[in-house]
Amino acid sequence: MTNSSPRPSGRRADQLRDVRITRHYTKHAEGSVLVEFGETKVICTASVVERVPEFLRERGQGWLTAEYGMLPRATHTRSDREAARGKQTGRTQEIQRLIGRALRAVFDLNALGPRTLHLDCDVIQADGGTRTASITGAFVAAHDAVTKLVAAGKIARSPITDYVAAISVGVFGGAPVLDLDYDEDSACDTDMNVVMTGAGGFVEVQGTAEGVPFSRAEMNALLDLAQAGIGELVRLQRAALEA
């Protein structure tokens, strides 16, 4: 696919930013990753907690949950820490719930046993697509954490049933494009976030028109772009885990 209106980055319409997944990025967490989508950089850690929420007590199954945050100067201007304000924004709550839903879609929580896998996604630099980068990186961190559980004999098998990754797509300059950076995201006509499994199943589709409604044909084109992009992200996840 080509784009008659050049992207600010010079990328093709169907081209991801440079994606890097660096495992074992921090020392203490059972799984840790630095994931980079171009200039967007997120540290994702996976921590094993040997207890479950009260609503799962005595059921014998596990739980997976996520938290998301941004450093004060992850963006162009400084923002106060949410802890200093004493309240999470609606955006933060929405994103961390999305990350949790995305990962739970590919986890057999019964196989995890009575413990919680806690994912923390901290944005150290934001240039668009922080939630999609967080999901993609958090999966790799979670994979490393459960691999350690299996190796330690705490669980009999991996609870992971498939890969999961996420990407943004949108209509920019009148054409569908893949993996929006900040310049594109702030000026696009349509913005959509797509979460899919390695097998091609949809976990979540979030799409919004920014003043100019999009057609069914445009939506189909966006989903096709997203599916191809997520296929490439899954390939990169596999390569990182096999390294």
Curated annotation (Swiss-Prot):
The keyword Lipid metabolism does not apply. One of its GO terms (molecular function) is tRNA binding. It catalyses: tRNA(n+1) + phosphate = tRNA(n) + a ribonucleoside 5'-diphosphate. It comes from the Bacteria. Gene3D superfamilies: GHMP Kinase, N-terminal domain. InterPro entries: ExoRNase_PH_dom1, ExoRNase_PH_dom2, ExoRNase_PH_dom2_sf, PNPase/RNase_PH_dom_sf, Ribosomal_Su5_D2-typ_SF, RNase_PH, RNase_PH_bac-type, RNase_PH_CS. Phosphate binds at residues 91, 129-131. The keyword Translocase does not apply. Keywords: Nucleotidyltransferase, RNA-binding, rRNA processing, Transferase, tRNA processing, tRNA-binding. Pfam families: RNase_PH, RNase_PH_C. Belongs to the RNase PH family. Phosphorolytic 3'-5' exoribonuclease that plays an important role in tRNA 3'-end maturation. Removes nucleotide residues following the 3'-CCA terminus of tRNAs; can also add nucleotides to the ends of RNA molecules by using nucleoside diphosphates as substrates, but this may not be physiologically important. Probably plays a role in initiation of 16S rRNA degradation (leading to ribosome degradation) during starvation. HAMAP family: RNase_PH (MF_00564). NCBIfam families: RNasePH. Homohexameric ring arranged as a trimer of dimers. This is Ribonuclease PH. It comes from Burkholderia thailandensis (strain ATCC 700388 / DSM 13276 / CCUG 48851 / CIP 106301 / E264).
